[in-house]
Amino acid sequence: MSTLFWILLVVAALIGGIAIGFFIARKYMMNYLEQNPPINEDMIRTLMMQMGQKPSQKKVNQVMRAMNVQMKNEKKS
């Protein structure tokens, strides 16, 4: 009987640890994305206007493509 109790206790602790870890990781990622939002097209347009450039859709697409390529290269390294 005590062996079955210990097995159930270990399984319950494992499931509890996984659940708690999931919620901690979720909260961490939500805080991270709130503090460091991903860059989108509107942010690039605003940045170009602040620099005195006229943000055409072609330029915005070029910058987005260049940033995506750079992010992929950084992930591979």
From Swiss-Prot:
It is a single-pass membrane protein. The chain crosses the membrane at residues 4-24. The keyword Glycoprotein does not apply. Its main location: membrane. One of its GO terms (cellular component) is plasma membrane. It is found in: Cell membrane. It comes from the Bacteria. Keywords: Cell membrane, Membrane, Transmembrane, Transmembrane helix. Belongs to the UPF0154 family. HAMAP family: UPF0154. This is UPF0154 protein EAT1b_0403. It comes from Exiguobacterium sp. (strain ATCC BAA-1283 / AT1b).
